[in-house]
Amino acid sequence: MATSYLSPGVYVEEVDRGTKPLEMVGTSTAAFLGECKTGPVNDPVLCTNWSQYTKNFGDFKNSEYLAHAVYAFFNNGGARAFVVNVGSESAKDDAGKAAKYIGKDNGPGTRTGLKALEDIDEVNIVVAPGQTDPAVQDAVLSHCENMRYRFAVLDAPEVIEKGGVDKITKPRDSKYGAYYFPWVEVYDPTKGNVLQPPSGFMAGIYARNDGERGVHKAPANEIVRGALGLKYGITKGEQDLLNPKGINCIREFPNRGIRVWGARTVSSDASWRYVNVRRLFNMVEQSIENGTQWVVFEPNDPRLWKRVTRDISAFLLRLWRQGALFGKSPEEAFYVKCDEETNPPEVIDAGQMIVEVGMAPVKPAEFVIFRIGQMPSGGGEVSE
């Protein structure tokens, strides 16, 4: 504070009140990978509406699934999508086709397929519409797991094997993806009514649900806009078989339209059974990582631990008040631990700071715990 003022007048002095509150990161930016006859290849293009997509890649006649998926995304509430055209050249076999989607890492700016999305930080949802090959779906799941804050929306095959819905198998176990069935009938201005994979619709519904209700709410019981029908009609008995397997159904109800009727991940871990729980933790973990990067320039001592605990607690308190966490009190909804126990001498000597966070996303006082560490390089590391 100034010790003296040399003349009469109004003086303004800015006072540092400490670090800024943690900001909630976005959750609804999607990335689409598909084959298209026109447009840039392996160069992610940001589209914020259908017109921007057609300007870069043309309309429905230029791709089998990609255009319809992006259109369904915007029609169902999506607002931002990065589109990666992996090229329309025919592959010799399934392995060759999968390789196009998996991509190659030739360095920044020259990566292809899924690798090209590693250059973009803001992607939250990853879709490869119509790609039901296990190798491609495994690659999409691995990408989301490695990038940590992304979630895969996967399609079941268009046609099920003889024997009924109990023959449907889901992808490999992962808490970073969800699987949807059946395919959706839509209108194509060049072909009439056609069947399209559900992933593009679901990515848009995720975005709509995030904006209207919050990422902590399950993206279920939502109308599928643009759907004229379904490849298969699912009965309650059939859904009772599919739901425990992590296969989310889209169903048609009398007088209620076509709706999403499931919100499970493909994980066998009960803690990560639901799509909204996984995506809520993605948002929280990324928000905390981004909002605590300043700590790498501060002395790693009890004063710092107290500031970090205060900032993260304030952020989680806002989420609790919004209904994202369960509990009659903040103590039942979350806890933050950053002290000498999480930061012993060997951690401090390594230039790291570790915070333990527990949240109750389903039941009060039943915490799902993760630890986040800030490193000298400025990067964060999360373990669950």
Q: Where do the language-model regions lie?
A:
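Short linear interaction motifs
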Residues: 96-116, 121
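Structured, hydrophobic secondary-structure cores that serve as assembly/anchoring elements
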Residues: 1-91, 112-384
